[in-house]
Amino acid sequence: MRYYRITIIRFINKYTKIMDWIESDSYLKGIINNKPKLHDPVRVASFDLDDTLIVRSKKTQKWKLVDSSIKQKIAELIENKYIIIVFTNQGGMSLNKKFDKPLWRKAMDDLVKILTSETDNDFYFAIYVAKKYDIYRKPNIGLWNLMKQDIKDEFNLDSVQISTKSFFCGDAAGRIYPSMFKKKLYPTSKGGDFSDTDRKFALNIGIKFLTPEEFYLDSKNSENLKTNYKLSGVNPTEIIDEIENTKLVNYKFKPRKKEMIVMIGQPGSGKSFFVKNYILPNGYVHINQDKCKTKAKCLSETENALSKGKSVVIDNTNPDVISRMTYTNLAKENNYDHVRAIIMETPDELAKHLNNVRHIYSSGTVPKVTDIAYNIYRKNFVLPQYEENFDKIETVTFYFDKSMLDDPKWKRSFMKFSEYK
């Protein structure tokens, strides 16, 4: 029965070229398939959408093809046994309440019809859309993994082997100066690429990366099309090399009786790792808002621990005087003489990368801290002073525990390039 259903769907798809759309909370995907089988290994010709395949009007939803040669090139790719895939970040779908998704899907159905108008061959064409800032958003490879699973299901395969001829083409390449196409599409633009997420996406997958110029112009002397680029944020390989070739000195934590410790640091700075490995083994009560859920519950648990004369560690971001003194005043009221501030000194780009690593490692169950939260932290941050009831203020440079690299999944998560703004 399933075979006949798939055959009918393929027949309908071939002549209507209407995609079968499926939506989840995090992604939207549309697939049109009329191929009975795939080339093995699978040849994937994948593309970004905006300013790679189409250029969109900023005022309306109207669009046009970036280059007129795209239809013939898609036909040639299909002739050469490639499947055609689009991977696109569309955060506006979740952030903009006025985003017209039915209209957008209709535009994509029209795009598929146009892009495949010059081929009579059977084809597999899919569009994968990341709606949120999570594991599916490029350069994270959630959409790529979703594509592989869909191929397995669609063709009843045990595994999917990707051909070395596969590639991803996108305009977010981290180029420093305006590209040839950018000058053509946006004549007044003087800056380079707005992002580098497309290049990082290809690097994270491990397939060839092409800029639109390299794909469309197909120059024999491709060096003329290459421009200088710079990847933002952390280069995971460089960090790993530094860790494996550097003798790191452990922080010497000295516990004190009847003490309150207030941790200070942005999300992803290593506070909780530090607390778990250095402070909690000494019997300190752990106060963390992710566990308590509310500020009131945190304060209640802190008050309870202090009333029993226990040492406590406040494991929150605590960027400003008010957030810190809410706790240090409790210590003073309970006659605590030992109140220590520990500042986690972690580079911004590394903290954001670790935020993404934590999200990937958890398979998306631990949500990413938003850029807005980072901006609020930076805006509110004030260095702690002794006048806040502290008798000791320490700064800890981020310490990377080599043992974390023994976990293959964690190392794979860390080695993926992340988006950095």
UniProtKB/Swiss-Prot annotation:
UniProt GO MF annotations: ATP binding; ATP-dependent polydeoxyribonucleotide 5'-hydroxyl-kinase activity; double-stranded DNA binding; polynucleotide 3'-phosphatase activity
GO biological process, one term: DNA repair
Organism: Acanthamoeba polyphaga mimivirus (APMV)
Assigned keywords, A-Z: ATP-binding, Hydrolase, Kinase, Multifunctional enzyme, Nucleotide-binding, Transferase
Signal peptide range in chain numbering: none
UniProt superkingdom: Viruses
Catalytic activity, as annotated: a 3'end (2'-deoxyribonucleotide 3'-phosphate)-DNA + H2O = a 3'-end 2'-deoxyribonucleotide-DNA + phosphate; a 5'-end dephospho-2'-deoxyribonucleoside-DNA + ATP = a 5'-end 5'-phospho-2'-deoxyribonucleoside-DNA + ADP + H(+)
InterPro entries reported in the protein's UniProt record: HAD-like_sf, HAD-SF_hydro_IIIA, HAD_sf, P-loop_NTPase, PNK3P
Pfam families, alphabetized: AAA_33 (PF13671), PNK3P (PF08645)
Ranges where the record places region Phosphatase: 25-231
Record-listed E.C. numbers: 3.1.3.32, 2.7.1.78
Positions of ATP binding: 265-272
Segments of this protein annotated with the region Kinase: 235-415
UniProt keyword annotation of Endoplasmic reticulum present: no
Homology family: In the N-terminal section; belongs to the DNA 3' phosphatase family.
Name under which the protein is recorded: Putative bifunctional polynucleotide phosphatase/kinase
NCBIfam families: HAD-SF-IIIA
